[in-house]
């Protein structure tokens, strides 16, 4: 499923549930800090971005609780550097609202296309040219609280990683992987996204605490708008994410 669809969900695991419980306690404390809210609240208060906001270590352990379980065993076969501190992504009712810096077209894309993107292809400079600055190994999502599927889950375009891989393998032909970060890939990236929207199915990736999901590093993904009638706790929809970088950068464009 992972190779063909570009993502995989893992069923309830007591070890993951214990980690999520510890992370939720810390997450509530983090979002209550005024300095963190000032730094990370975006989209008119509907999205707490929370990059590296949780105090987890290089193995993902947090608050004395190890990050373990089937999903971690499965990921151990992959090539990646130690984990960064976990991102804490919190979505609140009303998402999305315009983010500071959003153009009208940018906000429409956020609202109508879930701000779909491939992680690591950052917008660089005043002209926001796309470059591969963060060659991730994978995306690991760990829900921290129970929410309905209408509460802004991640969305993935199934099979999109195959299209992205083909496009970028061609784009990087003859270029040493050490130089990929300096290549302007804006045009090929935009063309690849258009192909994905035409050819791939958009699916909601919903999971509960104790469950987990892994998304391929090349998969086009985003965050769905908050729907009317969504069920979520007062603290909003909370998910922790890990995106460790590849140790071998040249593997990035491979499936």
Residue ranges, per PLM feature:
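Non-heme Fe(II)/2-oxoglutarate
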Residues: 166-169, 209, 214-255
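Residues that cap or initiate secondary-structure elements
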Residues: 16, 94, 148, 221, ...
């Amino acid at each position: 499923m992972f190779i063909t669809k570009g993502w995989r969900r893992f069923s309830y695991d007591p070890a993951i549930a214990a980690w999520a419980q510890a992370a939720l306690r810390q997450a509530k404390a983090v979002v209550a800090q005024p300095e963190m809210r000032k730094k990370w609240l975006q989209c008119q208060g509907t999205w707490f971005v929370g990059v590296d906001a949780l105090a987890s270590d290089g193995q993902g352990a947090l608050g004395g609780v190890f990050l373990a379980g089937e999903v971690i065993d499965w990921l151990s076969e992959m090539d990646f550097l130690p984990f960064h501190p976990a991102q804490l992504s919190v979505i609140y009712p009303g998402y999305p609202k315009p983010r500071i810096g959003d153009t009208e077209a940018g906000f429409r894309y956020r609202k109508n296309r879930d701000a779909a993107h491939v992680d690591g292809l950052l917008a660089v400079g005043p002209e926001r040219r796309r470059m591969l600055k963060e060659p991730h190994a994978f995306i690991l999502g760990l829900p921290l609280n129970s929410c309905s599927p209408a509460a802004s889950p991640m969305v993935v375009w199934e099979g999109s990683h195959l299209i992205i891989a083909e496009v970028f393998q061609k784009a990087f032909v003859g270029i040493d992987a050490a130089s990929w970060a300096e290549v302007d890939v804006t045009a090929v990236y935009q063309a690849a996204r258009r192909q994905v929207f035409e050819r791939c199915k958009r699916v909601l990736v919903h999971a509960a605490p104790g469950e987990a999901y892994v998304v391929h590093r090349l998969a086009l993904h985003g965050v769905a708008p908050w729907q009317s009638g969504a069920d979520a706790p007062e603290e909003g929809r909370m998910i922790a994410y890990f995106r460790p970088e590849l140790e071998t950068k040249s593997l990035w464009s491979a499936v």
